[in-house]
């Protein structure tokens, strides 16, 4: 797998979970002899929602909610077969979305 790169993108609502998962991936890749670039924190996406408190009147009274989506980006340069196998066997928490692209 020479001259290839694995790009890993992590998404989660909890920044502690995403940092823990990124550390596990970096540890696993370094143990198998691969070079890791990152994790690079990408901008946090904040989605805000305004909801009326009252079902009838008082339109000026509203509740505000938000969902923050944290993202991290990592590149594994020149991965070995051991690296790919170790990453496939890695068990990450349920709240973390992982996207893997081979370039």
From Swiss-Prot:
GO terms for cellular component: ribonucleoprotein complex; ribosome. Keywords: Ribonucleoprotein, Ribosomal protein. One of its GO terms (biological process) is translation. The keyword Magnesium does not apply. GO terms for molecular function: structural constituent of ribosome; tRNA binding. Disulfide bonds: none annotated. Signal peptide: none annotated. Gene3D superfamilies: Ribosomal protein S10 domain (3.30.70.600). It holds the Pfam family Ribosomal_S10. InterPro entries: Ribosomal_uS10 (IPR001848), Ribosomal_uS10_CS (IPR018268), Ribosomal_uS10_dom (IPR027486), Ribosomal_uS10_dom_sf (IPR036838). Belongs to the universal ribosomal protein uS10 family. Involved in the binding of tRNA to the ribosomes. Part of the 30S ribosomal subunit. This is Small ribosomal subunit protein uS10. It comes from Bordetella avium (strain 197N). The lineage of its organism: Bacteria, Pseudomonadati, Pseudomonadota, Betaproteobacteria, Burkholderiales. The gene is rpsJ.
């Amino acid at each position: 797998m020479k001259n290839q790169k694995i790009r890993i993108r992590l998404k989660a609502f909890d920044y502690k979970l995403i940092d823990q998962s990124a550390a596990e991936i970096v540890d696993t890749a370094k143990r198998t002899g691969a070079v890791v670039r990152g994790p690079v924190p990408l901008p946090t996406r904040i989605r805000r929602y305004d909801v009326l408190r009252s079902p009838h009147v008082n339109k000026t009274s509203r509740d505000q909610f938000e969902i923050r989506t944290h993202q991290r980006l990592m590149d594994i340069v020149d991965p070995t077969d051991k690296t790919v196998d170790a990453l496939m066997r890695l068990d990450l928490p349920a709240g973390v979305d992982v996207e893997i692209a081979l370039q």
